[in-house]
Amino acid sequence: MSSTSLIDDRDWSSLTLGERIRQIEVEGYLVLPGLLDAQQIADLKTLTATWETQATDYSESQRFRQNIEFDGGLINDLVIANPRTLEFLHALCGRDIILMSAIYARSEPGHPGISLHTDGQPYGSAIFGSAGSAPFMVRVLYYLDDLTPDISPFRVVPRSHLSFHADANPYYRFDSHPEEVMVPAEAGSAVLINHRVFHGNFPNVGSGSREMLALGYRPSW
């Protein structure tokens, strides 16, 4: 982490519904704490331990598995159809929402971090395909481990999805940004983002792995 990085460690549980909606609409990110309890996290970790994963093209220490929605069971009950998450998404987007993607990711010790990027690319891309071209999408990132400063915490550039500047080209990637923010969170929480905001994560310089379930939803309209 850069020594100049800000840390957003506010009490997210104190936000009202209106404040949560404003946070993700204007700032581009939001934390919903305590969506999964300790037993649910343990059950999901037992499941993920059985999955075969692939390494990303930039690091053997970053592993992933796509299309986890087809595993059903716990993934559907605890994650995809999590009632508290859906309640918020319905308030944000309307009653009808569509799941666009569901991915598992594990950042192991030695993971170099992910550069600042967007998941929203209006003409599609080889990485995100047509899903990235949806004009509105919310990414919901469930963390099965604590997001601490040394184990790949989330990073984001607030309000970057609002910029018209050429530097906000959604196909760009950046190593760092002077206004980037580190967002810690406890296991069982989810970070929600506007898919057009620039975000990534910091390196894993700790001794443990960090597991995440990343879902994408868009309003049906």
Regions found by a protein language model. Give the residues of each.
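A structural signal for short, well-ordered beta-strand segments
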Residues: 101-104, 140-142, 213-217
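Catalytic core of non-heme Fe(II) oxygenases with the double-stranded beta-helix
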Residues: 111-184
